[in-house]
């Protein structure tokens, strides 16, 4: 069975205060393509015998959300507007959490999920006549926490896996 593209969901916590309940924004409206660029750091070495070996040194993932059409009704809009227009660069405005969910079986209520700290950084502001755009890039940071997520009305609830 081949999973449909909508099986991979990406949420950003727009409650950047660091306290209280997460307020998850589902990334994807008006976006036709969204991928996690894993940014694999791969080194290939060839020895004097002509043999090749590969070293995987790690990942530097990023996610480009382009286009994002500025919409004051979107929970993520105030965060993007503050960063783009006030040029803020601090953790209070840019650092938050992301949640990736894979829906492998729509009949199940809990789905594999991973939560991770991240930075949400606008790339530009402006665009063409189709509307004001603030494309942004999500930069994951630190370790991921695996678990499950239940989703109701496009709002996830994350439960970490037991250790």
Predicted regions and their residues:
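Extracellular/virion structural assembly segments
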Residues: 2-3, 49-115, 146-154
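Short, low-complexity, polar/charged sequence segments that are solvent-exposed and flexible
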Residues: 83-88, 118-122, 139, 155-160
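Solvent-exposed edge beta-strands and adjacent loop segments
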Residues: 1-72, 119-130
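Short beta-strand and beta-hairpin "edge-sheet" elements
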Residues: 29-34, 100-146
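Protruding loop/beta-arch "assembly-hinge" segments enriched in small, turn-prone residues
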Residues: 135, 139-163
């Amino acid at each position: 069975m081949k999973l449909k593209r909508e099986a991979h969901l990406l949420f950003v916590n727009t409650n950047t205060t660091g306290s209280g309940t997460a307020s998850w924004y589902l990334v994807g409206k008006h976006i036709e393509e969204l991928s996690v660029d894993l940014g694999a750091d791969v080194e290939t070495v060839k020895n004097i015998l002509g043999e090749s070996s590969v070293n995987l040194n790690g990942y530097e993932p990023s996610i480009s959300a382009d286009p994002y059409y500025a919409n004051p009704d979107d929970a993520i809009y105030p965060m993007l507007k503050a960063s783009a227009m006030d040029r803020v660069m601090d953790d209070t405005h840019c650092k938050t959490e992301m949640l990736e969910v894979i829906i492998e079986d729509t009949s199940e209520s809990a789905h594999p999920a991973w939560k991770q700290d991240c930075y949400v950084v606008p790339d530009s502001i402006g665009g063409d006549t189709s509307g004001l755009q603030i494309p942004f890039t999500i930069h994951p940071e630190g370790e991921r926490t695996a678990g499950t997520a239940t989703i109701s009305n496009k709002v996830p609830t994350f439960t970490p896996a037991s250790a």
